[in-house]
Amino acid sequence: MEQEILRMKFVFDENKLKASGMTEDECLNIIRKYAFKHNLTEIEKGVFDSSDLDNTDPFFYIIMKLPDSKWFMKVIKEWTWYIENDIEDCIAAYYNAVIKNA
């Protein structure tokens, strides 16, 4: 049986970061500030983990708020949510929701 996890991973596109005048750390620091307030641990660069499998609210907040920022969707390359034994591509899910709600 696989170990259940609650984790979110962010990978930014270096070329898009340069074009927008941002750095990876600037982007991650915005996420880190929120994550640390909500008991999420950065287990490696850009990977945030919750030791409490019931602590999904911070992840839902990130999913709802980051795409609405002026910068996030322009520079994100990979955005993955590992919830228990499932893996969700948050970029694909976001664009699917946008298409459905258009």
Predicted regions and their residues:
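Intrinsic-disorder-associated interaction segments
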Residues: 24, 52-55, 80
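Extended, alpha-helix-rich binding/interface surfaces that flank or overlap catalytic cores
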Residues: 101-102
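Long, contiguous binding/interaction regions
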Residues: 2-28, 32-34, 66
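Short, mixed-charge low-complexity intrinsically disordered segments
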Residues: 61-97
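A general marker of short, structured functional hotspots
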Residues: 6-8, 30, 44, 55, ...
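Generic structural motif
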Residues: 13-15, 53, 84-86
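Residues in well-ordered beta-strands of folded domains
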Residues: 9, 49, 80-82
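Short, intrinsically disordered low-complexity segments
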Residues: 36-75
